[in-house]
């Protein structure tokens, strides 16, 4: 699964259908980040089964 955050931000996103999913000027990684925080919208989508993930 891919995780993205905007450059200069500490909030990581992991649902491609998140309204704040970064599409430019971002950092991407393949594993769960060990610093920063996970986006609340992404976590809500994950919990209710509507999170679209990028492999």
Residue ranges and their predicted role:
Residues 1-7:
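Short N-terminal "domain-start" leader segments
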Residues 26-37:
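Short linker/helix segments within small regulatory modules
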């Amino acid at each position: 699964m891919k995780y993205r955050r905007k450059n200069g931000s500490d909030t990581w996103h992991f649902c491609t259908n998140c309204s704040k999913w970064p599409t430019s000027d971002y950092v991407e990684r393949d594993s769960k980040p060990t610093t920063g925080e996970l986006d609340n919208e992404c976590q809500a989508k994950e919990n209710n089964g509507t999170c679209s993930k990028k492999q």
